[in-house]
A protein has these predicted regions:
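Short active-site segment of divalent metal-dependent hydrolases/proteases
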Residues: 13, 154-155
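Loop-to-helix element that buttresses phosphate recognition and phosphoryl-transfer chemistry
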Residues: 6, 12-66, 116-131
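Short basic (Lys/Arg) and small-residue
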Residues: 151
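Acidic, low-complexity terminal tails and accessory targeting/binding regions
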Residues: 1-4, 73, 84-99, 139, ...
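Phosphate-coordination/substrate-recognition cap region in phosphate-metabolizing enzymes
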Residues: 38-106
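A charged, well-structured terminal subsegment
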Residues: 107-110, 116
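Active-site signature of alpha/beta-hydrolase-fold catalytic machinery across serine-
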Residues: 66, 157, 161
Length: 213
């Protein structure tokens, strides 16, 4: 039975504006992010949705709530959709990470699957928890359309798993704030229909360096 998965990255946060590594830090949406969330909700308003799932972090949850209001639907919070834990990198700017963790940062940019964040997670950790919860979501809503609102790293590892891509190609594509990626799932056969669609944002699209998650 065909199930459609709409993968959404949260709208722009205050720390997306400054480029800080957010990880598990619970940042708010920026003013532009709130506008992005409204445009995203407008884009999805006519789509018949069976359920909306979100990370508990406010930047994702508030994005999902905006979609949910347009759909007249409550949000289902899933802790395993939370962003990667950057550990000691949380709250730092990229140049601060480079000064303190230069060799590890270079490995993160070249071979990200092999990096264990100091005091945090690895991409393998994130992939394990995120793919497990996604399998459960798909099983619970077979034949329907489900929105999953989460974070950059989580979306990248999920898409990598869906298309059979190695985690070391993590930097091969970007996922913008308030973007949509759509996957059709049919009894274990998955098809990526679109990736990082931001046409609904117009001039409100965030143009930032995606390396600071």
């Amino acid at each position: 039975m065909l199930t459609k998965l709409i993968l959404v990255r949260h709208a722009e946060s205050t720390w997306n504006q400054t480029g800080r590594y957010q990880g598990r830090i619970d940042t708010e949406l920026s003013d532009q992010g709130q506008k992005q969330a409204s445009l995203l909700a407008e884009r999805l308003q006519s789509v018949p949705v069976a359920a909306i799932y979100a990370s508990p972090l406010r930047r994702a949850l508030h994005t999902a709530i905006t979609i949910g209001v347009a759909q007249n639907m409550d949000i289902r919070v899933e802790p395993d959709l939370t962003e990667i834990d950057h550990g000691a990198w949380n709250g730092l700017l990229p140049d601060e990470v480079e000064k303190r963790f230069g060799p590890l940062l270079q490995q993160w940019l070249v071979s990200p699957s092999k990096v264990q964040m100091p005091g945090g997670e690895s991409l393998v950790d994130v992939s394990r928890r995120a793919t497990t919860v996604l399998s459960r979501i798909l099983a619970d809503h077979s034949g329907g359309t489900v929105v999953v609102c989460t974070h950059d790293a989580v979306l990248k590892v999920l898409i990598a798993d869906i298309i059979g891509m190695h985690l070391d190609r993590f930097w091969s594509f970007g996922i913008c704030n308030a973007s949509i990626s759509i996957v059709e799932c049919n009894q274990g056969s998955n098809r990526l229909l679109c990736l990082n669609d931001t046409c609904h944002l117009g001039p409100y699209r965030t143009e930032t360096d995606e390396q600071a998650l």
